Amino acid sequence: MPELPEVETVRRGLETLVLGQEIVAVTLKVPKMVKTDLETFALTLPGQIIQSVGRRGKYLLIDLGQLVLVSHLRMEGKYLLFPDEVPDNKHFHVFFELKNGSTLVYQDVRKFGTFDLIAKSQLSAFFAKRKLGPEPKKETFKLKTFEAALLSSQKPIKPHLLDQTLVAGLGNIYVDEVLWAAKVHPETASSRLNKAEIKRLHDETIRILALGIEKGGSTVRTYRNALGADGTMQDYLQVYGQTGKPCPRCGQAIVKLKVGGRGTHICPKCQKKRL
């Protein structure tokens, strides 16, 4: 699943490709992807001009002025821009024809991606309803708020970080990286974390997601950015996908286990499980 660094990289690519373009026609082949009114989606988008492309957590925000098209890539969604003819592909599901003759295509092998067309004035309420946490930046991701939320919960720390309420944008790859960097076992109850561990989790979340953005995201399975290029963050992953390899910190073999139903990579020496 594209996580915050991948979505931010897609955002930057889209802004380069389609900023200022007018949508002249929309073709939707998988109606279930649109979570707001289908007729409004089909009739309102033509004539709209893409004024900016933003992001909130893992959501892309295509700013159309008074309206915002909120796009979530889910597991394998991606955008491609074709300057003229669009090739046949059974995984192309949404087609945005632009005034300059190009077509922005949404591709999704698993058809899990979603679109919500909402008034810009409703954007805050949209994310509040989903209890989306702050962006992972020093200015918005406050240590004391993070600490209070952790200490009041019995949830294991990995599922807690994944649920998007503590901080927006973490997925399976980057949670494993953050937990390893902070020397925290993924099954540790949130309330049992000490202040030093909480600070490390906070600081490493900011650092690692920023690094992921800098490296253009992780191409682990099928991720490509909007320009069709791979990311390079996979070359900097310390534990995710490194089963059997030596821990970069202590040399112990990385192991893979299941936490909350998710494949999880840890160093059993650096990330000791509490009894």
Curated annotation (Swiss-Prot):
SUPFAM superfamilies: Glucocorticoid receptor-like (DNA-binding domain) (SSF57716), N-terminal domain of MutM-like DNA repair proteins (SSF81624), S13-like H2TH domain (SSF46946)
EC number(s) per entry: 3.2.2.23, 4.2.99.18
Active site: P2, E3, K58, R262
Keyword Transmembrane helix: no
GO MF terms, alphabetically ordered: 8-oxo-7,8-dihydroguanine DNA N-glycosylase activity; class I DNA-(apurinic or apyrimidinic site) endonuclease activity; damaged DNA binding; zinc ion binding
Biological process according to GO: base-excision repair
Necessary cofactors: Zn(2+)
The keyword Lyase is assigned to this record: yes
Annotated catalysed reactions: Hydrolysis of DNA containing ring-opened 7-methylguanine residues, releasing 2,6-diamino-4-hydroxy-5-(N-methyl)formamidopyrimidine; 2'-deoxyribonucleotide-(2'-deoxyribose 5'-phosphate)-2'-deoxyribonucleotide-DNA = a 3'-end 2'-deoxyribonucleotide-(2,3-dehydro-2,3-deoxyribose 5'-phosphate)-DNA + a 5'-end 5'-phospho-2'-deoxyribonucleoside-DNA + H(+)
Keyword annotations of the record: DNA damage, DNA repair, DNA-binding, Glycosidase, Hydrolase, Lyase, Metal-binding, Multifunctional enzyme, Zinc, Zinc-finger
Segments forming FPG-type zinc fingers: 238-272
Cofactor binding description: Binds 1 zinc ion per subunit.
Taxonomy, superkingdom: Bacteria
Entry binding sites for DNA: H91, R110
Pfam families: Fapy_DNA_glyco (PF01149), H2TH (PF06831), zf-FPG_IleRS (PF06827)
PANTHER family tied to this protein: FORMAMIDOPYRIMIDINE-DNA GLYCOSYLASE (PTHR22993:SF9)
HAMAP family associated with the record: Fapy_DNA_glycosyl (MF_00103)
Known partners and oligomeric status: Monomer.
UniProt family annotation: Belongs to the FPG family.
Function: Involved in base excision repair of DNA damaged by oxidation or by mutagenic agents. Acts as a DNA glycosylase that recognizes and removes damaged bases. Has a preference for oxidized purines, such as 7,8-dihydro-8-oxoguanine (8-oxoG). Has AP (apurinic/apyrimidinic) lyase activity and introduces nicks in the DNA strand. Cleaves the DNA backbone by beta-delta elimination to generate a single-strand break at the site of the removed base with both 3'- and 5'-phosphates.
Name of this protein: Formamidopyrimidine-DNA glycosylase
Species the sequence originates in: Streptococcus pyogenes serotype M1
Lineage of the species this protein comes from: Bacteria, Bacillati, Bacillota, Bacilli, Lactobacillales
